[in-house]
Amino acid sequence: MKYEAVIGLEVHAELLTESKIFCSCTTKFGGEPNTHVCPVCLGLPGTLPVLNKKVVEYAVRAGLALNCTIANFSKMDRKNYFYPDLPKAYQISQYDLPLCSNGYVEIEVDGKVKKIGIKRIHIEEDAGKLLHENTDGSLVDYNRAGVPLIEIVSEPDMSTPEEAYQYLTKLKSILEYTEVSDCKMQEGSLRVDTNVSVRPVGSTELGTKIELKNLNSFRAVQKALEYEIKRQIKVLEEGGTIVQETRRWNEAKGITEPMRTKEEAHDYRYFPEPDLVPIIVTDEWKEEIRKSLPEMPHRKRERFISEYGLPEYDAKIITSSKKIADFFEKCALEYDSPKAVSNWLMGEFSRLMNETGKEIDEVPVTPQMLVKLLKLIDNGVISGSIAKTVFEEMFGTGKEPEVIVEEKGLKQIANEDELREIIKKVIAENPKSVEDYKNGKEKAMGFLVGQVMKATKGKANPQLTNQILKEELSK
């Protein structure tokens, strides 16, 4: 019997408001433990919450960008459970009347467009953070308690780990573009829980659902789903039954492990939050927010293709991140070869960001500095290969490219007489390659060029090197 997977995702995104959802404490990441707190977010007796209007506005922005219906009337609810990181022993969330519902995003997998439904988006407060350090017990940092979140719940419309990966990538891009969240998984401002079950192909009945946690990257989501789908199919094929539970992804072992039995919604004993009035979003306010939405990724991609002549692949990669798209456009306005800019962003820039785990706004290279580097190549001051060395130094130190070139003596050798002497020496030292070239073996020319580059430590002007080599070899 063949099986298929059914996948749904719950994404928690911290909102980029300056203050918390029900008090004026800062939402800034970091800080000494328990310094961004007050009686309200600590849930002390006698305190009352006041809903931050910006939280509602940002949630509506996200909802509109994700094609949702925005409720004119919604309310907050208490979700009751006990855990040390929850100071009030309940979380203020939304239950039966979410702010946004019935949305969708379109993803592209294997050249086909698929619509993934968004069941609901609701607002809620974050909990604190447990710290398991070398002490007799665990510590709690409540700095994060009360930070505003939106929870985006998809429909179970995904059937492969790749679709889940593409959905998350698209969702992150939209949240960044709308400036609703910075989506930094390493700081916990974007968190993903995955629900997955399997069923016989063709069946409409859902299988037993497993929730996966401890997913700290989109690739981890993909790998965990790949493993979990295989595990569930194996259990069923061996005549077993799937137990509804929450499982943790173990990155080191590449497996999922049981955590606890999955709670049902009624275990939380939801009831309306008595200390907050209902949320009213008028049509006028909704329209005002809609008009303030920025250019979305798909529109920017179309514009980059038509305005800057980028190939579709380049435009898709560049516009997947708002920060990278903005960086590209600043460069393209100052430099007349947008394709060269995109090559650098997708090549060296991307490689070093991946190696260091940094985002483009966290590195010291500005658009103006990259343009200067590209102009140094165009003007023959340095070669393309030397430019990569210069760029690494720029990336690490923030120094201007011309300063690095001067300090390290990296200027190209463009003096014809000087270069001719080096080439004559290379020809004299490699008679076999010279003979091969004269016998029609073009690869020999590449070898000789490589020897010239080696002798000059990559500083020979490539065009001049080829020209002089051909002249000398024709003698």
Swiss-Prot record:
At the top of the EC hierarchy, this enzyme's class is: ligase
Which reaction is the catalytic activity of this chain? L-glutamyl-tRNA(Gln) + L-glutamine + ATP + H2O = L-glutaminyl-tRNA(Gln) + L-glutamate + ADP + phosphate + H(+); L-aspartyl-tRNA(Asn) + L-glutamine + ATP + H2O = L-asparaginyl-tRNA(Asn) + L-glutamate + ADP + phosphate + 2 H(+)
Q: Which Gene Ontology molecular-function terms are recorded? A: asparaginyl-tRNA synthase (glutamine-hydrolyzing) activity; ATP binding; glutaminyl-tRNA synthase (glutamine-hydrolyzing) activity
Q: Which UniProt keywords apply?
A: ATP-binding, Ligase, Nucleotide-binding, Protein biosynthesis
Is Lipoprotein among this UniProt entry's keywords?
A: no
Description of how the protein assembles with itself and partners? Heterotrimer of A, B and C subunits.
Described purpose of this protein according to its UniProt entry:
Allows the formation of correctly charged Asn-tRNA(Asn) or Gln-tRNA(Gln) through the transamidation of misacylated Asp-tRNA(Asn) or Glu-tRNA(Gln) in organisms which lack either or both of asparaginyl-tRNA or glutaminyl-tRNA synthetases. The reaction takes place in the presence of glutamine and ATP through an activated phospho-Asp-tRNA(Asn) or phospho-Glu-tRNA(Gln).
**Protein name, entry field:** Aspartyl/glutamyl-tRNA(Asn/Gln) amidotransferase subunit B
Q: What is the lineage of its organism?
A: Bacteria, Bacillati, Bacillota, Clostridia, Thermoanaerobacterales
Encoding gene (name): gatB
